[in-house]
């Protein structure tokens, strides 16, 4: 359990320095969370930080289940 909290702390610290990096480490490059965080960071640094910290704290990647839908 302590290593999980330590990893979360490091991800939040990275998210404060460079918001998309913390989200990338948790969810990957092609996730919706990463794309939203990247867009918010480009539009404004502070909204990117707020969203990144929210995503890292509120969404648990182990319990987070994605639903994939076919496009065609």
Curated annotation (Swiss-Prot):
Subcellular location: Membrane
Source organism, top-level taxon: Eukaryota
Keywords, comma-separated and alphabetical: Membrane, Transmembrane, Transmembrane helix
Pfam families: Pmp3 (PF01679)
Topology with respect to the bilayer: Multi-pass membrane protein
InterPro entries given in the database record: PMP3
Cellular component, GO, one term: membrane
Listed transmembrane segments: 9-29, 39-59
PANTHER family assigned: HYDROPHOBIC PROTEIN OSR8 (PTHR21659:SF115), HYDROPHOBIC PROTEIN RCI2 LOW TEMPERATURE AND SALT RESPONSIVE PROTEIN LTI6 -RELATED (PTHR21659)
Family affiliation: Belongs to the UPF0057 (PMP3) family.
Protein name: Hydrophobic protein OSR8
Lineage, opening ranks: Eukaryota, Viridiplantae, Streptophyta, Embryophyta, Tracheophyta
């Amino acid at each position: 359990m302590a290593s999980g909290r330590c990893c979360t702390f490091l991800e939040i610290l990275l998210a404060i320095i460079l918001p998309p990096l913390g989200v990338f480490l948790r969810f990957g490059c092609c996730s919706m969370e990463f794309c939203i965080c990247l867009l918010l960071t480009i539009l404004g640094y502070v909204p990117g930080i707020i969203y990144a910290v929210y995503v890292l704290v509120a969404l648990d990647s182990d319990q987070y289940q994605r639903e994939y839908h076919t496009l065609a």
